[in-house]
Amino acid sequence: MLTLLSPAKKLLSISKHYSKETSNPLLLDKALQLVKIMKLKSVEQIADLMDLSKQLAELNYERYQNFDLKNNPMNHSYPALFLFQGDVYQGLNANSWKDEEIEYAQSHLGILSGLYGFLRPLDRIQPYRLEMGVNLENPAGKNLYAFWSKIVTNILNQILAEQSNPVLINLASTEYFKVVDEKKLSYPLVTINFYEQKNSELKMIGILAKKARGMMAKYIMQNRIDSIEQIKEFSESGYLFNKEISSPNSLNFIRIH
């Protein structure tokens, strides 16, 4: 099984030091094409592109200007698993993982990325911001979906082909998962959702659903889950699988308040 997450906008200023072997992003050459485009953007253009404040636009302008293309794109880089911070990654809590859990995740967990396309947990990346949904003109079209869709879908098929149970588990946001061409996926896809129930009313609350996605990914990695039936047994933070509102391709969990 391969589990997919979205990245986070918020990054740790100082990532956890990881002394064991790390990896380079599989699609680094493609990512550097986008970096070259972003290096030509002014602070104002970056602010407009991603709807950022001047302060955040200046930060990301500096990030792209300092992005090392010639000598070593891995300079000032950190494993993706430890660099991302945010609701999903609070639930994931990767700093608490054992080394063997991190090693297992390297071939069973993926992070979709606007800049890097697809990341494994130990892929070293430079701090950046580039959401998948932005309309960044590039050689492939008017947005990042045009740039990444075929490439990312192909890499997912390649990784799934190496799995003992080749099922794609989608814990990514709609914005990010749109990059996957579902018609070109060669293997089954299962999406997992989390809902809150109060007074018999079901709601998906963004911040809570994001944290739950991270908790589910942690559960799958730490327990080396390799079947849909095992996923259904997830019960952290009061979430329980609900058969009535689920289907073979959509597993829905409810927490009652």
Swiss-Prot record:
Xref: InterPro entries: YaaA
GO BP terms in the entry: response to hydroperoxide
A Pfam short name: H2O2_YaaD
GO cellular component, one term: cytosol
Family indicated by similarity: Belongs to the UPF0246 family.
Protein name: UPF0246 protein lpg1366
Species lineage: Bacteria, Pseudomonadati, Pseudomonadota, Gammaproteobacteria, Legionellales
Species annotation: Legionella pneumophila subsp. pneumophila (strain Philadelphia 1 / ATCC 33152 / DSM 7513)
HAMAP family given in the database record: UPF0246
